[in-house]
C-alpha cells in the first residue's frame, strides 16, 4: 500500500520526467538535434562544433574562435550560449550566461574559457523543474555520490544544460600493446580548425598517461557495444592493461599505430598541444592528425534526462516510448557494476533492438 501511494505521488509530482540524469541512446554522428548559439555581440554565432566542457568544479566551458575573430573584451561579460532545437520550431531549450576566465592561443585559433554566471532550462515546465531540483538536493544531502567533486547549485544546473547536446561516449586508446590502456570518455568537443578539447579527472592515472604519451586515438562506439564503456570505466585507475584480455578484437590505428577496437565506427588520432590543470580535471587541447570513418551506424551517446523527457513529450505514444527508452538505457548500462569480462573466446556481439533507443 505504501509503495502504491509513493508511486501515485511521484506520478503527480514528476509525470513522465523522472528519468536517469545520464540517459544513453544511439544517434547519428555528428548529432543533428541541437544547435548551440553564442549571443551577446553582433549576430549570433553557431558554436555547436566549437565548444567543449573543460571541468566540472569549477564548471568551465571552452569556446574556440578563428585567430582574430574572438569577441571584443568589452563584450565578453555579456555573452551567453543558447541551446536550440535544430529543426521544427527551433525552440530555445536552455541558456547559460558566461563569465570569462582566461584565453589560450594556438596556431590559427584562440580559445576562451568561461564559467557560468546564470543558467536557465526550458526542457520542463518551471514547477516540474523546481520539483526535480528539490529531489536532487535531497538525494545529495542523503548520499553524496559526487565522487569528490563539489559543485555549486549554479554549476549543477549549467552542467545539466551542457548535456542537452548529445555527447558521444568514446573509447580512448593510449600507448602500445606492451604498455597502454583503453578507457571511456564523454567530456569532449570539437573546437574548430582541426582542434579538439577533452577533459579527464586530474587525480586518476588516465590523465597522466595521456599527458605523457602526447597522442591518443579516439574510437566512436556503435550503439550495440555501448555497455563496454561501463565495463572499461575502471581502467581510468590503471597504468596499463593486458590487451589480450579485452572482450573484443583490436587493430592498429593508421597514423600512430595505437590499438583501437575493430568495431569502431570512426577513429580520430590526435596530438596533444597543451594541458591545463583546472579544478577537478585536466583539460587537453589536441590537434586532429587523422580522421577515419569506417562505417555508418548509430553512435553511443549520452544526454541529460531533462532533454530526453522533452524529446519524449513530442511523441504521441509517450508512455510506451518512455518504457521502451528506459529499457534501452538500462540495457546499455548493464555493464556498469560488472568487472571487465575476461576474453575466453570470440567476443559475442549482442545486437540491440533499434526500437529500444529513442
Give the role of each language-model region.
Residues 2-358:
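Basic, polyanion-binding surface patches
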Amino acid at each position: 500500500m505504501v509503495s502504491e501511494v509513493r508511486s501515485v505521488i511521484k506520478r503527480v509530482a514528476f509525470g513522465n520526467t523522472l528519468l536517469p540524469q545520464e540517459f544513453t541512446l544511439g544517434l547519428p554522428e555528428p548529432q543533428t538535434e541541437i544547435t548551440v548559439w553564442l549571443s551577446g555581440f553582433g549576430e549570433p554565432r553557431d558554436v555547436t562544433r566549437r565548444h567543449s566542457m573543460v571541468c566540472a568544479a569549477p564548471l568551465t566551458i571552452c569556446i574556440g574562435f578563428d585567430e582574430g575573430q574572438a569577441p571584443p573584451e568589452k563584450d565578453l561579460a555579456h555573452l551567453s550560449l543558447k541551446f536550440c532545437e535544430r529543426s521544427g520550431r527551433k525552440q530555445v531549450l536552455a541558456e547559460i550566461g558566461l563569465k570569462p576566465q582566461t584565453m589560450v592561443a594556438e596556431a590559427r585559433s584562440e580559445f576562451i574559457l568561461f564559467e557560468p554566471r546564470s543558467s536557465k532550462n526550458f526542457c520542463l515546465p518551471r514547477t516540474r523543474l523546481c520539483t526535480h531540483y528539490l529531489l536532487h538536493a535531497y538525494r545529495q544531502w542523503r548520499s553524496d555520490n559526487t565522487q569528490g567533486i563539489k559543485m555549486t547549485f549554479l554549476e549543477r544546473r549549467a552542467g545539466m544544460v551542457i548535456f542537452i547536446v548529445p555527447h558521444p561516449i568514446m573509447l580512448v586508446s593510449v600507448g602500445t600493446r606492451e604498455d597502454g590502456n583503453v578507457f571511456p570518455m564523454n567530456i569532449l568537443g570539437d573546437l574548430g580548425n582541426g582542434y579538439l578539447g577533452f577533459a579527464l579527472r586530474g587525480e586518476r592515472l588516465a590523465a597522466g598517461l595521456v599527458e605523457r604519451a602526447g597522442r591518443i586515438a579516439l574510437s566512436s562506439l556503435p550503439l550495440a557495444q555501448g555497455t563496454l564503456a561501463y565495463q572499461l570505466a575502471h581502467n581510468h585507475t590503471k597504468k596499463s592493461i593486458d590487451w589480450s584480455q579485452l572482450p573484443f578484437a583490436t587493430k592498429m590505428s593508421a597514423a600512430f599505430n595505437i590499438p583501437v577496437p575493430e568495431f569502431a565506427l570512426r577513429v580520430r588520432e590526435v596530438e596533444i598541444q597543451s594541458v591545463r590543470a583546472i579544478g577537478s580535471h585536466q583539460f587537453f587541447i589536441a590537434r586532429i592528425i587523422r580522421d577515419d570513418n569506417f562505417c555508418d551506424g548509430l553512435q553511443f551517446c549520452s544526454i541529460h534526462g531533462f532533454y530526453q523527457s522533452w524529446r519524449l513529450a513530442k511523441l504521441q505514444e509517450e508512455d510506451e516510448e518512455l518504457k521502451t527508452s528506459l529499457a534501452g538505457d538500462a540495457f546499455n548500462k548493464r555493464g556498469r557494476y560488472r568487472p571487465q569480462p575476461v576474453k575466453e573466446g570470440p567476443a559475442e556481439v549482442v545486437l540491440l533492438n533499434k526500437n529500444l533507443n529513442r
